Each structure stands twice: as structure tokens, then as C-alpha cells.
A protein has these predicted regions:
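Extended alpha-helical targeting/anchoring segments
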Residues: 1-135
Length: 135
């Protein structure tokens, strides 16, 4: 990343939260069969394939979520507030795992999402967000 940045060459990086798995690739080296991204319009997804995948669906989407309890969220929220008040942080993104049951594939979720920032990695995960985390 340092070398590419110093050379002012664009790159995509993906790092898991445990910092155990890292991907750093230049856009022209990314295999779109294995990884798709759309970062506020900077994308390797062809417009025609996006629309065709979405329009080919004939049945309703099955989508069921299993969020944490309000009490569990409140506990996490109060912990974050305590750290902010203690001066340990001034910016926090409080998130929690929410299991989802659906008949969509991970790629279907990517294609269906209208988020400004999204990424799909074949057979691994999909992620999407309305906001950028690193700029």
C-alpha cells in the first residue's frame, strides 16, 4: 500500500477486522469473477450485467433478520458512551452482527444493494455501506 500510494497508483485494499487477511490489488489486476466492487461509482461491475441480474428475478425475495435484543444494544451503546466520556475516543462506529436468512446468494445481495459503497468476494462475503470508512 505504501509503495502504490507513493507511486500515486490506485489500488483496492480489504483488511478483515482481526487484520489476519489482507488483499491489496491494483484495479486492472482484479478478477471480476472473484471480486466485485462499487465505491461510489468507481467500479469493476458492468452496468448491463447489474441490470440483467436484478431484472431476471421473478419471485419475491425472502429476507429474515435476527437482530440483537434492545437490551444488548443498549449495553453496547452505554459502553461506547462511557469510553467517549473518558476521552478514549471521539469517533465510533457501533456495529453488531445481525444474522440474515435469505434465498439470495452473496452476489445477489451485492447486485441488489443500492449502497454507495459495496464489495463482493466470491464464496466469502458481501459488504455494503452508505458511507466511506477510509479516504
Amino acid at each position: 500500500m505504501n509503495r502504490l500510494g507513493a507511486e500515486r497508483r490506485p489500488f483496492l485494499f480489504v483488511i478483515d477486522y482481526k487484520q489476519e487477511q489482507v488483499i491489496v490489488e491494483e484495479p486492472d489486476q482484479i478478477d471480476s469473477e472473484a471480486l466485485l466492487y462499487n465505491l461510489d461509482g468507481v467500479t469493476n461491475v458492468a452496468t448491463a450485467s447489474r441490470m440483467n441480474d436484478r431484472e431476471n428475478r421473478t419471485s419475491a425475495i425472502r429476507w429474515e433478520t435476527f437482530p440483537i435484543t434492545q437490551s444488548a444494544y443498549a449495553d453496547s451503546f452505554h459502553k461506547v458512551v462511557g469510553h467517549i466520556r473518558a476521552g478514549n475516543s471521539y469517533l465510533v462506529n457501533l456495529t453488531c452482527a445481525t444474522p440474515v436468512r435469505t434465498d439470495l446468494s452473496l452476489k445477489d445481495v451485492f447486485v441488489s444493494s443500492e449502497a454507495r459503497y459495496k464489495l463482493w468476494m466470491k464464496d466469502r462475503f458481501v459488504v455494503f455501506s452508505p458511507e466511506i470508512f477510509v479516504k
